[in-house]
């Protein structure tokens, strides 16, 4: 039993004694991203998807650690330079620091990113109350529409709208401003990854409520 693990039912690990908040996510080529043909965009998607776990808890991420595996093609000099450039951009944008990691060989590209921040409090999943209002940030479904376009399951001509949805797939907006206020007014929170209904159900079940 480790109380900091929050019963493995939350987005993060929270060491209340030391004010440490940690989240870890793994992304597999063909499962969590289509391919590694645009490594500069894929790494941005991975960074933002990972640090959003901390933002949704009301915590500002400070450090990230990246473990990656791939083949010679995915780890080519050209791709590594693109990844390096994107990581620098993301570090400046979100004021985070790449602080370690590891690389190894594999057939498919796989990336594990661990995010770390500090906070005396977090917004947990299991604190919902009856009659709580429900809020979301951003436009739900933009990233999914971008995925459908890339998979050629949704056809849009080369318009600003098409470019917009693809951009949201690779570079989702993070609620950095509202995140700092969550601890003051939110009883519960979750980083949406399985759709609004699916993740709302998780919040309700974790809080032993029903609908």
Please place each PLM-identified region on the residue numbering.
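Helix-biased detector of long, well-ordered alpha-helical tracts
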Residues: 1-211
